Protein backbone atom coordinates (compact mmCIF):
# COMPACT_ATOMS: atom_id res chain seq x y z
CA UNK A 1 0.00 0.00 0.00
CA UNK A 2 1.38 3.37 -1.04
CA UNK A 3 1.66 5.90 1.76
CA UNK A 4 1.73 9.65 1.33
CA UNK A 5 2.73 12.38 3.75
CA UNK A 6 -0.76 13.87 3.71
CA UNK A 7 -2.42 10.51 4.38
CA UNK A 8 -0.07 9.76 7.30
CA UNK A 9 -0.62 13.17 8.82
CA UNK A 10 -4.39 13.03 8.48
CA UNK A 11 -4.49 9.48 9.87
CA UNK A 12 -2.47 10.64 12.87
CA UNK A 13 -4.74 13.63 13.42
CA UNK A 14 -7.82 11.42 13.05
CA UNK A 15 -6.47 9.01 15.67
CA UNK A 16 -5.62 11.79 18.12
CA UNK A 17 -9.02 13.43 17.63
CA UNK A 18 -10.82 10.13 18.16
CA UNK A 19 -8.84 9.44 21.34
CA UNK A 20 -9.65 12.90 22.66
CA UNK A 21 -13.34 12.44 21.84
CA UNK A 22 -13.38 9.07 23.62
CA UNK A 23 -11.62 10.56 26.63
CA UNK A 24 -14.06 13.48 26.75
CA UNK A 25 -17.02 11.10 26.46
CA UNK A 26 -15.84 9.02 29.41
CA UNK A 27 -15.16 12.10 31.51
CA UNK A 28 -18.54 13.63 30.68
CA UNK A 29 -20.27 10.39 31.67
CA UNK A 30 -18.52 10.33 35.06
CA UNK A 31 -19.34 14.00 35.65
CA UNK A 32 -23.00 13.35 34.82
CA UNK A 33 -23.09 10.43 37.27
CA UNK A 34 -21.43 12.53 39.98
CA UNK A 35 -23.88 15.37 39.37
CA UNK A 36 -26.82 12.97 39.58
CA UNK A 37 -25.56 11.47 42.85
CA UNK A 38 -25.16 14.90 44.42
CA UNK A 39 -28.54 16.01 43.13
CA UNK A 40 -30.27 12.97 44.61
CA UNK A 41 -28.45 13.25 47.95
CA UNK A 42 -25.91 10.40 47.62
CA UNK A 43 -23.10 12.54 49.00
CA UNK A 44 -20.89 9.70 50.26
CA UNK A 45 -21.10 7.86 46.95
CA UNK A 46 -20.27 11.06 45.08
CA UNK A 47 -17.25 11.67 47.32
CA UNK A 48 -16.01 8.11 46.76
CA UNK A 49 -16.39 8.54 43.00
CA UNK A 50 -14.56 11.86 43.14
CA UNK A 51 -11.71 10.33 45.14
CA UNK A 52 -11.32 7.36 42.79
CA UNK A 53 -11.58 9.25 39.49
CA UNK A 54 -9.58 12.33 40.63
CA UNK A 55 -12.30 14.51 39.08
CA UNK A 56 -13.27 17.35 41.38
CA UNK A 57 -16.90 18.39 41.36
CA UNK A 58 -15.79 21.97 42.02
CA UNK A 59 -13.78 22.14 38.79
CA UNK A 60 -16.55 20.93 36.47
CA UNK A 61 -20.25 21.59 36.34
CA UNK A 62 -23.01 20.25 34.13
CA UNK A 63 -24.35 22.62 31.49
CA UNK A 64 -27.89 23.94 31.55
CA UNK A 65 -30.71 21.62 30.47
CA UNK A 66 -28.38 18.60 30.66
CA UNK A 67 -29.18 15.87 33.14
CA UNK A 68 -28.64 12.12 33.33
CA UNK A 69 -32.35 11.48 33.76
CA UNK A 70 -33.14 13.69 30.77
CA UNK A 71 -30.63 11.81 28.61
CA UNK A 72 -32.22 8.50 29.59
CA UNK A 73 -35.66 9.82 28.72
CA UNK A 74 -34.40 11.01 25.34
CA UNK A 75 -32.92 7.59 24.66
CA UNK A 76 -36.20 5.88 25.58
CA UNK A 77 -38.09 8.19 23.21
CA UNK A 78 -35.63 7.53 20.38
CA UNK A 79 -35.80 3.77 21.00
CA UNK A 80 -39.59 3.83 20.95
CA UNK A 81 -39.68 5.82 17.72
CA UNK A 82 -37.31 3.39 16.04
CA UNK A 83 -38.56 0.03 17.35
CA UNK A 84 -42.10 0.85 18.59
CA UNK A 85 -41.25 -0.36 22.08
CA UNK A 86 -39.42 0.93 25.11
CA UNK A 87 -35.89 -0.34 25.86
CA UNK A 88 -35.19 -2.76 28.68
CA UNK A 89 -32.42 -1.15 30.71
CA UNK A 90 -32.14 -3.55 33.66
CA UNK A 91 -33.14 -7.09 34.42
CA UNK A 92 -33.57 -9.13 37.55
CA UNK A 93 -30.32 -10.64 38.74
CA UNK A 94 -29.72 -14.33 39.27
CA UNK A 95 -29.31 -15.98 42.63
CA UNK A 96 -26.87 -14.10 44.85
CA UNK A 97 -24.51 -17.07 45.14
CA UNK A 98 -24.44 -17.92 41.43
CA UNK A 99 -24.44 -14.35 40.17
CA UNK A 100 -21.42 -13.49 38.02
CA UNK A 101 -19.67 -10.27 38.93
CA UNK A 102 -19.45 -7.83 36.01
CA UNK A 103 -15.94 -7.48 34.66
CA UNK A 104 -14.62 -4.06 33.68
CA UNK A 105 -14.33 -3.64 29.94
CA UNK A 106 -11.01 -2.73 28.46
CA UNK A 107 -10.44 0.30 26.28
CA UNK A 108 -10.44 -1.81 23.13
CA UNK A 109 -13.80 -3.37 24.00
CA UNK A 110 -15.20 0.05 24.74
CA UNK A 111 -14.13 1.31 21.35
CA UNK A 112 -15.57 -1.72 19.58
CA UNK A 113 -18.82 -1.45 21.49
CA UNK A 114 -19.03 2.22 20.68
CA UNK A 115 -18.44 1.64 16.99
CA UNK A 116 -21.02 -1.15 16.81
CA UNK A 117 -23.65 0.79 18.68
CA UNK A 118 -23.54 3.71 16.27
CA UNK A 119 -23.88 1.82 13.02
CA UNK A 120 -27.66 2.13 12.87
CA UNK A 121 -27.77 5.83 13.79
CA UNK A 122 -28.68 8.32 11.05
CA UNK A 123 -25.98 10.64 9.82
CA UNK A 124 -26.14 14.30 10.69
CA UNK A 125 -27.03 16.50 7.76
CA UNK A 126 -29.25 13.99 5.96
CA UNK A 127 -32.99 14.42 5.70
CA UNK A 128 -34.70 12.17 8.18
CA UNK A 129 -38.33 11.08 8.13
CA UNK A 130 -39.57 10.10 11.56
CA UNK A 131 -42.33 7.47 11.47
CA UNK A 132 -44.83 7.73 14.25
CA UNK A 133 -46.22 4.50 15.74
CA UNK A 134 -49.30 3.34 13.80
CA UNK A 135 -52.13 1.22 15.19
CA UNK A 136 -52.69 -2.36 14.07
CA UNK A 137 -56.06 -1.51 12.46
CA UNK A 138 -54.27 0.67 9.99
CA UNK A 139 -52.25 -2.29 8.76
CA UNK A 140 -55.39 -4.44 8.45
CA UNK A 141 -57.30 -1.87 6.41
CA UNK A 142 -54.44 -0.81 4.24
CA UNK A 143 -52.73 -4.15 3.70
CA UNK A 144 -54.09 -4.50 0.18
CA UNK A 145 -52.91 -1.03 -0.84
CA UNK A 146 -49.39 -1.80 0.47
CA UNK A 147 -49.26 -5.01 -1.52
CA UNK A 148 -50.25 -3.17 -4.68
CA UNK A 149 -47.69 -0.45 -4.03
CA UNK A 150 -44.96 -3.06 -3.57
CA UNK A 151 -45.89 -4.67 -6.89
CA UNK A 152 -45.75 -1.29 -8.61
CA UNK A 153 -42.37 -0.50 -7.07
CA UNK A 154 -41.04 -3.85 -8.28
CA UNK A 155 -42.08 -3.07 -11.82
CA UNK A 156 -40.61 0.44 -11.71
CA UNK A 157 -37.29 -0.63 -10.21
CA UNK A 158 -36.81 -3.67 -12.39
CA UNK A 159 -37.86 -6.30 -9.87
CA UNK A 160 -35.69 -5.13 -6.97
CA UNK A 161 -38.13 -4.26 -4.21
CA UNK A 162 -36.70 -2.25 -1.33
CA UNK A 163 -37.27 -3.33 2.23
CA UNK A 164 -40.45 -2.01 3.75
CA UNK A 165 -39.87 1.39 5.30
CA UNK A 166 -41.88 0.75 8.45
CA UNK A 167 -39.81 -2.30 9.35
CA UNK A 168 -36.49 -0.47 9.65
CA UNK A 169 -37.70 3.06 10.38
CA UNK A 170 -36.29 4.54 7.15
CA UNK A 171 -37.93 6.23 4.18
CA UNK A 172 -36.75 4.66 0.90
CA UNK A 173 -37.59 6.49 -2.32
CA UNK A 174 -36.63 5.86 -5.93
CA UNK A 175 -34.35 8.23 -7.83
CA UNK A 176 -35.60 9.20 -11.27
CA UNK A 177 -33.03 9.88 -13.95
CA UNK A 178 -32.96 13.09 -15.91
CA UNK A 179 -34.18 13.07 -19.45
CA UNK A 180 -30.77 14.01 -20.84
CA UNK A 181 -28.97 11.06 -19.21
CA UNK A 182 -28.83 7.72 -20.91
CA UNK A 183 -30.62 4.82 -19.30
CA UNK A 184 -28.00 2.28 -20.35
CA UNK A 185 -25.06 1.39 -18.09
CA UNK A 186 -21.71 2.84 -19.08
CA UNK A 187 -19.33 -0.09 -18.74
CA UNK A 188 -16.14 1.80 -19.57
CA UNK A 189 -16.73 4.69 -17.24
CA UNK A 190 -13.53 5.94 -15.55
CA UNK A 191 -13.80 6.81 -11.86
CA UNK A 192 -11.15 9.13 -10.44
CA UNK A 193 -10.45 7.48 -7.08
CA UNK A 194 -7.46 9.74 -6.40
CA UNK A 195 -9.57 12.89 -6.42
CA UNK A 196 -12.18 11.18 -4.24
CA UNK A 197 -9.53 10.25 -1.66
CA UNK A 198 -8.05 13.75 -1.73
CA UNK A 199 -11.48 15.30 -1.17
CA UNK A 200 -12.10 12.94 1.74
CA UNK A 201 -8.71 13.74 3.31
CA UNK A 202 -9.31 17.46 2.86
CA UNK A 203 -12.70 17.28 4.51
CA UNK A 204 -11.36 15.18 7.40
CA UNK A 205 -8.49 17.59 7.98
CA UNK A 206 -10.88 20.55 8.06
CA UNK A 207 -13.14 18.75 10.54
CA UNK A 208 -10.16 17.94 12.76
CA UNK A 209 -8.97 21.55 12.61
CA UNK A 210 -12.38 22.69 13.85
CA UNK A 211 -12.64 20.04 16.54
CA UNK A 212 -9.08 20.54 17.77
CA UNK A 213 -9.97 23.99 19.06
CA UNK A 214 -11.73 22.38 22.03
CA UNK A 215 -9.04 19.77 22.75
CA UNK A 216 -6.96 20.19 25.87
CA UNK A 217 -4.40 17.40 26.27
CA UNK A 218 -3.24 18.72 29.63
CA UNK A 219 -1.91 15.85 31.80
CA UNK A 220 -3.81 17.23 34.79
CA UNK A 221 -7.07 16.87 32.82
CA UNK A 222 -6.40 13.27 31.79
CA UNK A 223 -8.80 10.62 33.06
CA UNK A 224 -6.94 7.78 34.82
CA UNK A 225 -8.38 4.28 34.87
CA UNK A 226 -9.53 3.10 38.31
CA UNK A 227 -7.14 0.91 40.26
CA UNK A 228 -10.05 -1.16 41.58
CA UNK A 229 -10.41 -2.87 38.19
CA UNK A 230 -6.72 -3.82 38.07
CA UNK A 231 -5.80 -7.54 38.31
CA UNK A 232 -9.27 -8.80 39.10
CA UNK A 233 -10.01 -9.29 42.78
CA UNK A 234 -6.46 -9.67 44.07
CA UNK A 235 -6.36 -7.25 46.98
CA UNK A 236 -2.59 -7.50 47.49
CA UNK A 237 -1.84 -6.53 43.91
CA UNK A 238 -4.31 -3.66 44.09
CA UNK A 239 -2.57 -2.30 47.19
CA UNK A 240 0.79 -2.42 45.40
CA UNK A 241 -0.81 -0.83 42.34
CA UNK A 242 -2.08 2.01 44.53
CA UNK A 243 1.52 2.64 45.64
CA UNK A 244 2.75 2.78 42.04
CA UNK A 245 -0.21 4.91 40.92
CA UNK A 246 0.92 7.74 43.19
CA UNK A 247 3.91 8.21 40.86
CA UNK A 248 1.78 8.71 37.74
CA UNK A 249 2.65 12.21 36.55
CA UNK A 250 -0.56 14.26 36.50
CA UNK A 251 1.00 17.72 36.51
CA UNK A 252 2.04 19.60 33.40
CA UNK A 253 5.80 20.34 33.58
CA UNK A 254 5.38 22.77 30.64
CA UNK A 255 8.68 21.83 28.98
CA UNK A 256 8.63 21.81 25.17
CA UNK A 257 11.19 20.34 22.82
CA UNK A 258 12.16 23.85 21.72
CA UNK A 259 12.90 24.77 25.34
CA UNK A 260 15.81 22.30 25.40
CA UNK A 261 18.88 23.99 23.94
CA UNK A 262 21.18 21.61 22.11
CA UNK A 263 20.88 17.82 22.55
CA UNK A 264 19.58 17.46 18.98
CA UNK A 265 20.62 13.80 18.66
CA UNK A 266 19.10 12.88 22.02
CA UNK A 267 15.82 14.65 21.18
CA UNK A 268 15.64 12.92 17.81
CA UNK A 269 16.15 9.45 19.30
CA UNK A 270 13.64 10.05 22.09
CA UNK A 271 11.06 11.19 19.54
CA UNK A 272 11.72 8.10 17.41
CA UNK A 273 11.19 5.84 20.41
CA UNK A 274 8.21 7.52 22.09
CA UNK A 275 6.51 10.18 19.96
CA UNK A 276 6.56 8.97 16.36
CA UNK A 277 5.36 5.37 17.00
CA UNK A 278 2.20 6.74 18.61
CA UNK A 279 1.70 9.42 15.98
CA UNK A 280 2.51 7.32 12.89
CA UNK A 281 2.01 3.62 13.75
CA UNK A 282 1.89 2.65 10.05
CA UNK A 283 5.64 3.23 9.78
CA UNK A 284 6.62 1.19 12.87
CA UNK A 285 5.70 -2.39 12.00
CA UNK A 286 7.78 -5.54 11.63
CA UNK A 287 11.50 -4.86 11.78
CA UNK A 288 10.71 -1.16 12.26
CA UNK A 289 8.95 -1.76 15.58
CA UNK A 290 9.84 0.96 18.12
CA UNK A 291 12.52 0.53 20.74
CA UNK A 292 11.28 -0.64 24.12
CA UNK A 293 14.00 0.81 26.32
CA UNK A 294 16.24 3.89 26.28
CA UNK A 295 19.18 4.67 28.53
CA UNK A 296 20.02 8.34 28.98
CA UNK A 297 23.45 8.65 30.60
CA UNK A 298 25.88 11.47 31.01
CA UNK A 299 27.30 13.94 33.52
CA UNK A 300 24.83 15.44 36.00
CA UNK A 301 23.07 18.63 34.98
CA UNK A 302 23.14 18.04 31.22
CA UNK A 303 19.38 17.74 30.63
CA UNK A 304 18.40 14.09 31.11
CA UNK A 305 15.48 14.86 33.42
CA UNK A 306 14.56 17.78 31.17
CA UNK A 307 14.13 15.35 28.27
CA UNK A 308 11.81 13.25 30.42
CA UNK A 309 9.75 16.34 31.29
CA UNK A 310 9.46 17.16 27.59
CA UNK A 311 8.15 13.65 26.97
CA UNK A 312 5.59 14.12 29.74
CA UNK A 313 4.51 17.44 28.23
CA UNK A 314 4.44 16.63 24.52
CA UNK A 315 3.30 12.98 24.49
CA UNK A 316 -0.24 11.92 25.24
CA UNK A 317 0.84 8.87 27.25
CA UNK A 318 0.54 7.82 30.88
CA UNK A 319 3.86 8.95 32.36
CA UNK A 320 5.28 7.01 35.33
CA UNK A 321 7.94 9.05 37.14
CA UNK A 322 9.51 6.27 39.22
CA UNK A 323 12.27 6.83 41.76
CA UNK A 324 14.32 4.26 43.62
CA UNK A 325 12.32 4.67 46.83
CA UNK A 326 9.13 3.55 45.06
CA UNK A 327 10.27 0.08 44.03
CA UNK A 328 12.70 -0.66 46.88
CA UNK A 329 11.28 -2.29 50.00
CA UNK A 330 12.85 -3.67 53.16
CA UNK A 331 10.55 -6.70 53.04
CA UNK A 332 11.86 -9.63 51.09
CA UNK A 333 10.02 -10.20 47.82
CA UNK A 334 8.13 -6.90 47.80
CA UNK A 335 10.58 -5.20 45.42
CA UNK A 336 10.08 -7.92 42.82
CA UNK A 337 6.30 -7.62 43.20
CA UNK A 338 6.46 -3.84 42.83
CA UNK A 339 8.47 -4.10 39.61
CA UNK A 340 6.01 -6.66 38.24
CA UNK A 341 3.02 -4.50 39.20
CA UNK A 342 4.74 -1.47 37.64
CA UNK A 343 4.94 -3.04 34.19
CA UNK A 344 1.50 -4.64 34.42
CA UNK A 345 0.08 -1.27 35.45
CA UNK A 346 1.85 0.33 32.49
CA UNK A 347 0.14 -2.17 30.17
CA UNK A 348 -3.16 -1.45 31.91
CA UNK A 349 -2.77 2.31 31.26
CA UNK A 350 -1.25 1.83 27.77
CA UNK A 351 0.18 3.72 25.97
CA UNK A 352 2.60 4.37 28.83
CA UNK A 353 6.08 5.74 29.41
CA UNK A 354 8.15 4.66 32.44
CA UNK A 355 10.92 7.02 33.55
CA UNK A 356 13.33 5.46 36.06
CA UNK A 357 15.62 8.08 37.56
CA UNK A 358 19.06 6.89 38.75
CA UNK A 359 18.56 3.38 37.44
CA UNK A 360 21.93 2.21 38.74
CA UNK A 361 20.77 2.77 42.32
CA UNK A 362 18.31 -0.14 42.14
CA UNK A 363 20.83 -2.60 40.68
CA UNK A 364 23.02 -4.99 42.66
CA UNK A 365 25.81 -2.48 43.13
CA UNK A 366 25.42 1.22 43.80
CA UNK A 367 27.48 3.36 41.45
CA UNK A 368 27.64 6.72 39.72
CA UNK A 369 27.48 5.75 36.07
CA UNK A 370 26.27 3.31 33.44
CA UNK A 371 29.21 0.97 34.07
CA UNK A 372 27.46 -0.34 37.18
CA UNK A 373 24.43 -1.59 35.27
CA UNK A 374 23.76 -5.29 34.96
CA UNK A 375 24.53 -6.68 31.50
CA UNK A 376 21.12 -8.34 31.23
CA UNK A 377 19.48 -4.99 31.94
CA UNK A 378 21.85 -3.29 29.52
CA UNK A 379 20.78 -5.67 26.75
CA UNK A 380 17.15 -4.65 27.20
CA UNK A 381 18.02 -0.97 26.91
CA UNK A 382 18.23 -1.03 23.14
CA UNK A 383 19.20 2.62 22.71
CA UNK A 384 21.98 4.05 24.87
CA UNK A 385 22.16 7.80 24.39
CA UNK A 386 24.96 9.94 25.76
CA UNK A 387 23.68 13.29 27.02
CA UNK A 388 27.02 15.05 26.90
CA UNK A 389 28.17 18.47 28.03
CA UNK A 390 26.84 21.27 25.83
CA UNK A 391 28.80 22.45 22.81
CA UNK A 392 30.07 26.00 22.30
CA UNK A 393 26.99 27.01 20.29
CA UNK A 394 24.68 25.52 22.93
CA UNK A 395 26.54 27.27 25.76
CA UNK A 396 26.35 30.57 23.90
CA UNK A 397 22.60 30.12 23.34
CA UNK A 398 22.09 29.26 27.03
CA UNK A 399 23.89 32.40 28.20
CA UNK A 400 21.89 34.52 25.76
CA UNK A 401 18.68 32.89 27.00
CA UNK A 402 19.32 33.48 30.69
CA UNK A 403 21.02 36.88 30.24
CA UNK A 404 19.37 38.69 27.31
CA UNK A 405 20.50 42.23 26.41
CA UNK A 406 17.52 43.68 28.30
CA UNK A 407 15.70 41.85 31.09
CA UNK A 408 12.64 43.46 32.65
CA UNK A 409 11.46 41.17 35.43
CA UNK A 410 8.99 42.41 38.08
CA UNK A 411 9.43 46.00 36.93
CA UNK A 412 13.21 46.04 37.51
CA UNK A 413 15.21 46.56 34.34
CA UNK A 414 18.55 44.79 34.07
CA UNK A 415 20.82 45.45 31.09
CA UNK A 416 23.60 43.25 29.77
CA UNK A 417 26.68 44.15 27.75
CA UNK A 418 28.15 40.72 27.10
CA UNK A 419 30.29 39.17 24.41
CA UNK A 420 28.36 35.91 24.06
CA UNK A 421 30.87 34.32 21.69
CA UNK A 422 33.77 34.86 24.10
CA UNK A 423 31.78 33.63 27.08
CA UNK A 424 30.78 30.52 25.12
CA UNK A 425 34.47 29.65 24.77
CA UNK A 426 35.28 30.42 28.41
CA UNK A 427 32.55 28.11 29.74
CA UNK A 428 34.07 24.98 28.21
CA UNK A 429 33.38 21.99 30.49
CA UNK A 430 30.35 23.57 32.18
CA UNK A 431 27.05 21.70 32.17
CA UNK A 432 23.68 23.30 31.55
CA UNK A 433 22.90 23.62 35.25
CA UNK A 434 26.37 25.10 35.86
CA UNK A 435 25.81 27.77 33.20
CA UNK A 436 22.45 28.65 34.72
CA UNK A 437 24.09 29.01 38.13
CA UNK A 438 26.80 31.28 36.68
CA UNK A 439 24.20 33.45 34.91
CA UNK A 440 22.21 33.75 38.12
CA UNK A 441 25.30 34.77 40.07
CA UNK A 442 26.31 37.33 37.43
CA UNK A 443 22.83 38.89 37.52
CA UNK A 444 22.99 38.99 41.31
CA UNK A 445 26.13 41.16 41.44
CA UNK A 446 24.46 44.52 40.62
CA UNK A 447 21.53 43.66 42.92
CA UNK A 448 23.86 43.26 45.93
CA UNK A 449 25.00 46.87 45.57
CA UNK A 450 21.53 48.26 46.39
CA UNK A 451 21.07 46.21 49.56
CA UNK A 452 23.16 48.64 51.64
CA UNK A 453 21.03 51.59 50.55
CA UNK A 454 17.84 49.71 51.41
CA UNK A 455 19.02 48.48 54.82
CA UNK A 456 20.72 51.71 55.97
CA UNK A 457 17.73 53.93 55.17
CA UNK A 458 16.24 54.98 58.54
CA UNK A 459 14.44 58.24 57.72
CA UNK A 460 10.75 57.65 57.09
CA UNK A 461 10.16 61.07 55.52
CA UNK A 462 13.02 60.96 53.04
CA UNK A 463 12.12 59.06 49.90
CA UNK A 464 14.41 56.45 48.44
CA UNK A 465 15.78 57.05 44.96
CA UNK A 466 14.47 55.03 42.02
CA UNK A 467 16.17 51.66 41.79
CA UNK A 468 18.64 51.59 38.92
CA UNK A 469 20.77 48.50 38.44
CA UNK A 470 24.20 48.64 36.88
CA UNK A 471 24.86 46.93 33.57
CA UNK A 472 26.33 43.43 33.72
CA UNK A 473 29.49 43.34 31.61
CA UNK A 474 31.71 40.60 30.26
CA UNK A 475 34.28 41.25 33.00
CA UNK A 476 31.62 40.66 35.66
CA UNK A 477 30.75 37.34 34.06
CA UNK A 478 34.44 36.37 33.89
CA UNK A 479 34.88 37.15 37.60
CA UNK A 480 31.96 34.87 38.40
CA UNK A 481 33.53 32.11 36.29
CA UNK A 482 36.74 32.44 38.30
CA UNK A 483 34.85 31.60 41.52
CA UNK A 484 32.37 29.03 40.10
CA UNK A 485 33.99 25.84 38.86
CA UNK A 486 32.29 23.19 36.69
CA UNK A 487 30.81 20.31 38.64
CA UNK A 488 31.15 17.46 36.11
CA UNK A 489 34.12 18.29 33.91
CA UNK A 490 36.15 15.35 35.19
CA UNK A 491 33.35 12.88 34.37
CA UNK A 492 33.20 13.70 30.65
CA UNK A 493 36.14 11.45 29.75
CA UNK A 494 34.68 8.58 31.79
CA UNK A 495 31.36 8.70 29.95
CA UNK A 496 33.10 9.06 26.59
CA UNK A 497 35.15 5.93 27.26
CA UNK A 498 32.01 3.98 28.20
CA UNK A 499 30.32 5.28 25.05
CA UNK A 500 33.12 3.95 22.86
CA UNK A 501 32.56 0.47 24.32
CA UNK A 502 28.75 0.24 24.65
CA UNK A 503 27.39 2.85 22.24
CA UNK A 504 24.01 2.13 20.61
CA UNK A 505 22.40 5.08 18.81
UniProtKB/Swiss-Prot annotation:
SUPFAM superfamilies: P-loop containing nucleoside triphosphate hydrolases. The keyword Nucleotide-binding applies. Pfam families: AAA (PF00004), AAA_lid_3 (PF17862), LisH (PF08513). Coiled coil: none annotated. One of its GO terms (molecular function) is microtubule severing ATPase activity. Residues 94-127, 140-167 are annotated as: Disordered. Transmembrane segments: none annotated. InterPro entries: AAA+_ATPase (IPR003593), AAA_lid_3 (IPR041569), ATPase_AAA_core (IPR003959), Katanin_p60_AL2 (IPR027497), LisH (IPR006594), MT-severing_AAA_ATPase (IPR050304), P-loop_NTPase (IPR027417). It is an enzyme of class 5 (isomerase). One of its GO terms (biological process) is microtubule severing. GO terms for cellular component: cytoplasm; microtubule; spindle; spindle pole. It catalyses: n ATP + n H2O + a microtubule = n ADP + n phosphate + (n+1) alpha/beta tubulin heterodimers. It is found in: Cytoplasm, Cytoskeleton; Cytoplasm; Cytoplasm, Cytoskeleton, Spindle; Cytoplasm, Cytoskeleton, Spindle pole. Its EC number is 5.6.1.1. ATP binds at residues 298-305. Residues 114-127, 155-164 have a biased composition (Polar residues). Keywords: ATP-binding, Cytoplasm, Cytoskeleton, Isomerase, Microtubule, Nucleotide-binding. Its main location: cytoplasm. Residues 25-57 form the LisH domain. Belongs to the AAA ATPase family. Katanin p60 subunit A1 subfamily. A-like 2 sub-subfamily. Severs microtubules in vitro in an ATP-dependent manner. This activity may promote rapid reorganization of cellular microtubule arrays. This is Katanin p60 ATPase-containing subunit A-like 2. It comes from Xenopus laevis (African clawed frog).
